[in-house]
Amino acid sequence: MSWQQYVDQHLVATQCVTMAAICGLDGSIWAKSNGLELSQDEVATLARSFSKDEVLAANGIRIGGTKYIYLSGDDKLIRGKKDRQGVHIVKTKTAMVMALYAEPILPEQCAVVVEKLGDWLIQNDL
């Protein structure tokens, strides 16, 4: 299965994710939803930001030029929100699974889908 199929079939097709991407920890973009504008700089900055609460709280989370308010996170997870939209990012051994959602999707719905794929990737050393 290609990375694009993971984005399309395991994230967006669930209807619990509006747009998604899978990116390398080096900032490379492996697959993304149509219409999701990402820069390698944004992705690389996010990859370096896990477990840096003070940096994320001060600077927010930038995806596609949009700044999201940092809500919470740890060494494998980052959560953010802006108005009626949000972002949920899971770090695996080699990648980040990044998902955006908008109302009426609930943050918890997005989280379950993203974390399930993230857990599967971790179990498979990806």
From Swiss-Prot:
Q: Which Gene3D superfamilies match?
A: Dynein light chain 2a, cytoplasmic (3.30.450.30)
State the UniProt keywords alphabetically.
Actin-binding, Cytoplasm, Cytoskeleton
What SUPFAM superfamilies would the database entry show? Answer: Profilin (actin-binding protein)
Q: Which InterPro entries match?
A: PFN (IPR048278), PFN_euk (IPR005455), PFN_sf (IPR036140), Profilin_CS (IPR027310)
Q: Please identify the protein, giving its name as recorded.
A: Profilin
Q: What does it do?
A: Binds to actin and affects the structure of the cytoskeleton. At high concentrations, profilin prevents the polymerization of actin, whereas it enhances it at low concentrations. By binding to PIP2, it inhibits the formation of IP3 and DG.
Any single GO molecular-function term of the entry would be: actin monomer binding
CDD domains given in the database record: PROF
Kindly list the places in or outside the cell where this protein is found, as annotated in its UniProt entry.
Cytoplasm, Cytoskeleton
Q: Which family does it belong to?
A: Belongs to the profilin family.
- SMART domains tied to this protein: PROF
Q: Which organism is it from?
A: Branchiostoma belcheri
Among Pfam families, the record links this protein to: Profilin (PF00235)
